[in-house]
Amino acid sequence: MTETREPTETGGYASLEEDDEDLSPEPDSEEEEEEEEEETTDDPEYDPGYKVKQRIGGGRGGPSRRAPRATQPAGPPAQPCQLCGRSALGEAPPGTPPCRLCCPATATQEAPGPESRALGEEEEEPSRTGETRPAGRDGDEDEEEGGTYHCTECEDSFDNLGELHGHFMLHARGEV
């Protein structure tokens, strides 16, 4: 589109834009607001599609929020078991067995004792304790059944809830 310029009173040509807007020394507040809106579209609060972009790989493309398990720093030293108060493996005084809930690896090496039974089993077992049944046989029966408790992270089977709890805590610390 061609426009003809008309000579102004001073003999020069008139600007194509209006003089009132261009000659003002102060910038328009409308232009600043538009610029601010453009800057805030990357902010998740202002961009409704931000989460969708993150899921499909668009957006900022930053690293995953989850840290890899291998790079997690080691936590504070092991605390005593919150259930029984015993020290964890390595911190137990000599001659004292460590807590089975804090250290399930130790629990699998030791023979099953009354501590490792579930609450319901303790009430039923006292009548059987006098019978001549080998202690190792109880564990063999559970292995054939595949255990009663299963880890949701790795599908391992455990005989009692305490062992499952200890195993799951190892997952939480990133040790398994």
Curated annotation (Swiss-Prot):
Compositionally biased region (Basic and acidic residues): 126-138
C2H2-type Zn finger ranges: 149-171
Organism: Mus musculus (Mouse)
InterPro entries documented for this protein: ZNF428, Znf_C2H2_type
Acidic residues composition bias: residue spans: 16-46
PANTHER family: ZINC FINGER PROTEIN 428
Keywords on record: Metal-binding, Phosphoprotein, Zinc, Zinc-finger
Modification Phosphothreonine occurs at: 96
Protein name (record): Zinc finger protein 428
PROSITE patterns: ZINC_FINGER_C2H2_1 (PS00028), ZINC_FINGER_C2H2_2 (PS50157)
Region of interest (Disordered), residue spans: 1-152
GO function term, MF aspect, one: zinc ion binding
